[in-house]
Amino acid sequence: SRSTVPTLEAAKALGEIKKRIHIPIVADIHFDYRMAIAAIENGADKIRINPGNIGSAERVKAVVDKAKEYNIPIRVGVNSGSLEKNIVEKYGKVTAEGLVESALDKVKMIEDMGYDNLVVSIKSSDVLMCAKAHELLAPKCPYPLHVGITEAGTLFRGNIKSAIGLGIILNQGIGDTIRVSLTGNPVNEIASAKQILKTLGLRKGGVEVVSCPTCGRTNIDLIGLANE
């Protein structure tokens, strides 16, 4: 389970949340390195940061040192919407190559600080760019990859984008964990992610209902029956 930790109160709530769930909790950190430290101290099983928006190298190191103390993984997240200006200028625009360069630079920064308990994530709302970035990153990265199409959209549009993007990536054997990002109830994200994995033969369980699109031979309420 992933929870955003924008305040100290949110960080302190992690301990209570952990008492009520049976799965690991990931703290999503934006900008304030102190929230990462507080989240770790309050029981986060993993933290997600973008070192590029945490601040100075000293602040990143403070987070890395705390993660090392508690031996929890850091997910290094790179997003097409916040790619560094110098990399965008180098490639002329946001590109898959630029996303990979940014991710590997951040990984090296943390490795140089003496830590390698890492997970890497590259996300974009551009399906084909995201797929290409993962194809480029996978052979260069020894760490687990968290895969997702960010800002995919509302339930209908977001499910289609996520299914296509994740399908391309996962079908190449790339990816260790996934997230479907939808604007709506996050419970729908879980159902969609499970169905994508089942469709690709990567998850078992449940029943697959096979139903035709209806035709002139249909003489029952097939749509209602299938939905039921």
Which sequence ranges carry the predicted segments?
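Glycine-enriched alpha-helix->loop->beta-strand junction motifs that scaffold or abut catalytic
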Residues: 20-23, 41-47, 68-70, 138-144, ...
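N-terminal active-site wall of soluble small-molecule enzyme domains
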Residues: 2-42
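Catalytic alpha/beta core domains of metabolic enzymes, predominantly
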Residues: 79, 87-228
